[in-house]
C-alpha cells in the first residue's frame, strides 16, 4: 500500500501553499550583496512521478524579475530535484526543520546547504543558505517568508 506524502514527509507537507518574503545575500564577511522579494508556490501534487512542485518568482526594486520551476520525486523520505537549474535533495531533521543540499548546474564547482525552520502555526518560516564555490564559503542567504495562501 502506497503511503500518503504527508505521512512520509509531514514537515515538508506543512510548507504546502504560497509564500512571500525577502531574500538578503551576504558575503562571507557579512556585507549585504543583494536583496529581493520572493513569491514561492509550494505544492504537494497527486502526481506519482513528481509529488512535489515549486515555482519561485523573484523581483528586485529595479524592475528585474526571475521565475523558475522545480519538480521533485520522493524516495526514502527525501525529495529529489534534478532540473535544468539544480540537482539535490531535501529531508526532515525534526518537527520544524528541513535540510537541503544541491548544486547549481550553471555555476561550476558550486554547492549549497540550506536549513528551513517552520513555526508551529505553519504560517512563517526562516531559511538560511550556505553557498560554496570551489569548497569555499562565498555567500550566505537569509530568507524570511510568510504563508499567504494555504
Located regions from the model:
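Structural motif
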Residues: 18, 97, 122-124
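Generic preference for well-ordered secondary structure
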Residues: 3, 26, 96, 100, ...
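Amphipathic/hydrophobic helical signal segments and adjacent flexible N-terminal regions
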Residues: 1-69, 133-150
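Surface-exposed coil/turn segments at beta-strand junctions on protein surfaces, enriched
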Residues: 12-14, 93, 120
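Alpha-helical interaction segments
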Residues: 8-10, 70, 81, 119-121
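Glycine-rich, aromatic-bearing surface loops/beta-hairpins
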Residues: 102-104, 108-150
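Central antiparallel beta-sheet cores of small beta-barrel/beta-sandwich binding domains
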Residues: 33-107, 111-112
